[in-house]
Amino acid sequence: MSLLPAPETTRLSVAPMMDWTDRHCRVFHRLLAPHARLYTEMVHAQAVILGDRDRLLGFDAVEHPVALQLGGSDPAHLAQASRIGADWGYDEINLNVGCPSDRVQAGRFGACLMREPSLVAECVAAMVAASPAPVTVKCRLGVDEMEDYGVFRAFIDTVASAGCGLFVVHARKAWLQGLSPKENREIPPLRYDWVHQLKRERPDLRIVLNGGLATVDDSVSALAHVDGVMIGRAAYHEPYRLHLMDRAMFTPGLAPWERGQLLRAYRPYVEDCRARGVAVKHITRHILGLFHGQPGGRAFRQVLSEGAPRSDAGWDLIERALAVTERREDAA
């Protein structure tokens, strides 16, 4: 059996999201949620082996605990990539068995692997043997016509027997044809009862629930049935919710920070990035939702969106955007 992360570090996590959870996003999320486990975007095993590792794997020390999510279906390649990821300092290596996109299917990885539990088990066994870091799996309830809990349970049992002790379960199945990745996050019905049943029947496994968890109450109440929750789009589009979830789960006696306080704590990182030549637009895109639903929220987004493409834009742009929200708050 692979090592398991410390239980308190898997109670709350932020999902791996392609094109979103890059290193700039993860540092921002760490400021919002000091106790959450963060995940990289999915990286194909071959890219880890052959690609620019600093670009693909580099992360800031503040991100710990942080997991590297791998895609692939070749056990030898996944083993090599897992070892590389562990050597880079990642706290967990996660195998993606949940992404339903056409591109991913064409490469024979992601959700389509739920049809091949023995292959997934072979991949996991190779990864566990190669990696000193814990190896975990993120999966769905099934794909296409799979409608039977027993098939899902058999998949989990097969992969667990290869050494995986933690499963992040997106509580929907995926349709491999006919639905876009976005539709696959929304149209297939949520079946939390399957995930709850899995935890009851396999109490030896660490089970993290993913899918449809958008509020503090949703997330906290889910912990009565599973070991942890993983938040996806809600954490990105309305990041202040992530801060409130972290507070509610870990430090309920502490008042949440104000949005402006949280953003100003990001300043040293932003200025360090600018000093290294990183364009501010790569950073500001991750903070656009911080004032969602608040006075001045639309103006905040507008100031950032209009100013970020300028090559000389820096922290002063973010301060100008903050000033707009503070004026609106005073007026209210």
Predicted regions span which residues?
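Flavin-dependent oxidoreductase catalytic cores
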Residues: 1-332
